[in-house]
Regions:
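Short, low-complexity N-terminal intrinsically disordered segments enriched in polar/charged residues
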Residues: 1-38, 148-158
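A short hydrophobic beta-strand element
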Residues: 91-100
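Short beta-strand edge/turn micro-motifs at domain boundaries
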Residues: 116-140
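Short, cysteine-centered beta-strand-loop-beta hairpins and adjacent loop/turn segments enriched
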Residues: 102-112
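A solvent-exposed, acidic/Ser-Thr-rich amphipathic alpha-helical stretch
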Residues: 40-89
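Short beta-strand segments enriched in hydrophobic/aromatic residues
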Residues: 39-40, 100-102, 117, 133
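Hydrophobic/aromatic beta-strand elements that line small-molecule binding cavities or substrate pockets
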Residues: 82-86, 114-119
């Protein structure tokens, strides 16, 4: 079930869950300035299943911002599912499963992605985010060509 009316600051939710809800909300709103404020200055954003020539990780809030700042020019996200949260023995780490629906602006093709994210929170900020997504879905949505997909992200640096 998809829901784009995420509830933020629910007192029954952990800090990590609240931050994830804000993360998704700001993505839907295309507010990358608020989105990046959720990240620690020394955060790490990892993509363990990214395609070849895609960075395995991006280190530092400013580099993460350079990676994400043009995202709203490439894709319109319509909604995210309510994340299924798995708590870990470390209360600062959670695992979230969720889906999104959107459309790639340049191709007009739908974007329907499934995510599993491992998120670590330190001092109320995202300190480490492992983003497990299917690059084949993204490549197909960008027209089926890996080069076109990679060219859509000129801010990527390995």
């Amino acid at each position: 079930m998809m829901n784009d009316n995420l509830t933020v600051n629910n007192t029954n939710k952990s800090a990590g869950e609240q931050i994830l809800e804000q993360f998704l909300k700001f993505m839907l709103e295309k507010d990358m300035d608020k989105w990046i404020d959720l990240w620690d200055e020394h955060a790490i954003f990892e993509f363990p299943f990214g395609p070849s020539n895609y960075p395995e990780k991006i280190e530092g809030r400013s580099n993460i911002y350079n990676y994400i700042k043009d995202f709203p020019k490439k894709i319109t996200l319509f909604k995210f599912s309510i994340p299924q949260i798995h708590h870990t023995l470390n209360s600062n780490i959670l695992i979230a499963e969720f889906k999104c629906e959107g459309q790639i602006i340049n191709t007009g093709l739908p974007y329907k992605q499934k995510y599993i994210s491992v998120i670590e929170i330190s001092n109320g900020k995202i300190s480490h985010y492992k983003d497990y997504w299917n690059p084949l879905v993204a490549i197909e949505s960008f027209g089926g060509n890996l080069a076109t997909f990679l060219d859509s992200s000129p801010n990527l640096k390995q």
